[in-house]
Amino acid sequence: ELLSRIRQLVGPAMPIVASLDLHANVTQRMLAQSDALVSYRTYPHIDMADTGELAAQLMQRRLKLGRKEPMFSRRFPFLISLNAQSTWMAPAKSAYEQLLALDRESGVMLSFCMGFPASDFEECGPVVWGHGPQAEAVVEQLFKAVSEPSVWRPHWLPARDAVVRSEEH
């Protein structure tokens, strides 16, 4: 809604680039109303300044090109528990390592929002997207690498085992 209202105010010629929380539920409307979006790549969120730099790079690319860069996105057909979203451990850690490697290799600016699963609306859930000439191929590559549902299922210890384990440490 916010990006749509900004777009209404500034018109189609004014570039709009925004940064998003890693847990954002990214909608097709958000992608359509902006010239570019980039998400945080860490949870806990320790990359605010880095994400601002990425947004500035996207704006610079947009201004240099004189139009919106090609963008492609893929939505996951499942939700990711918040407990599986920490980028300090698997599976999110390896997902973002793959994102960074593809980002560097391809020049496509990639983002992966894992979504906020407690939201209740149709477009709630994880989305990967990218900006750049090879966006479709690179997004498809990342999507295939990180979209296996079984990888994202958190492992829960039974209560008794959790107590025993906590006493050991």
Predicted segments with their positions:
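C-terminal accessory domains and tails appended to enzymatic cores
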Residues: A92-D161
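Extended redox/cofactor-interaction regions of prokaryotic respiratory oxidoreductases
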Residues: R165
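Conserved small/polar residues in nucleotide/adenosyl-binding loops
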Residues: E168-H169
